[in-house]
């Protein structure tokens, strides 16, 4: 039987994986180019998106050892994990409100969300040893992995359907559907 902490650990993957599928992999890069950076030259918007991701990941590269060391010597793992998750959830929700042409705002909030998502995942992985033991660590990890695919995939399918048939969902355009998809990721993630 799994502990409540192990079940919560497994469920969380179903929520935050929606960010990876809907935002990172599917909609943000395309929407950045077509909505927020549509007035820029193709090479420029591609470069800006690349730089935004690079900066976010470099900050993660340089801060992760400090986050890891801090959580090793203090009882801040859950606090930081919750904080990173909350900041990422709010940053993704903000994407809904950013108007067309505001590429810098979109890139900043995406960069914050991406950084906090990845930093939170580092702590999430670290917590596996806290919610499991030698006999069930592989099973709990596998359940989390599977539930992440299930949760992220399910919301992505709904979001993809929203962009294919926005009128079916009461939306006026594909752009509105994508914006609602960002908001749905925040809600989905919060629920898990």
Where does each model-flagged region fall?
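Helix-loop boundary and gating motifs at the non-cytosolic
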Residues: 1-57, 104
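Central cavity-lining transmembrane alpha-helices of secondary-active solute carriers
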Residues: 23-27, 46-69, 90-91, 153-156
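A membrane-interface helix-boundary motif in multi-pass transporters
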Residues: 40-48, 77, 143, 160-187
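MFS 12-TM fold signature
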Residues: 53-56, 85-92, 148, 188-192
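C-terminal ends and interior cores of transmembrane alpha-helices
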Residues: 61, 82-103
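Cytoplasmic membrane-interface "Motif A"-like loop-to-helix N-cap segments
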Residues: 71-87
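Cytoplasmic helix-loop-helix junction between adjacent transmembrane helices
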Residues: 109-146
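Glycine-rich segments within core transmembrane alpha-helices of 12-TM secondary carriers
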Residues: 138-163
């Amino acid at each position: 039987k799994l502990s409540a902490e192990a079940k919560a650990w497994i469920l969380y993957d179903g929520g935050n994986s929606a960010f990876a599928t809907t935002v990172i992999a599917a909609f943000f890069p395309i929407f950045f180019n077509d909505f927020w950076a549509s007035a820029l030259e193709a090479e420029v918007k591609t470069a800006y998106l690349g730089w935004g991701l690079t900066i976010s990941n470099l900050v993660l590269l340089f801060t992760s050892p400090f986050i890891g060391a801090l959580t090793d010597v203090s009882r801040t793992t859950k606090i930081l994990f919750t904080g990173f998750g909350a900041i990422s959830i709010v940053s993704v929700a903000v994407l809904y409100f950013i108007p067309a042409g505001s590429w810098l705002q979109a890139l900043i909030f995406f960069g914050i969300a991406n950084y906090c998502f990845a930093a939170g995942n580092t702590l999430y992985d670290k917590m596996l040893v806290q919610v499991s033991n030698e006999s069930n660590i592989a099973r709990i990890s596998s359940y989390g992995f599977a539930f992440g695919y299930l949760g992220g995939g399910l919301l992505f399918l709904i979001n993809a359907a929203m962009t294919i048939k926005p009128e079916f969902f009461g939306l006026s355009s594909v752009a509105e559907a994508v914006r609602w998809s960002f908001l749905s990721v925040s809600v989905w993630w919060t629920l898990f």
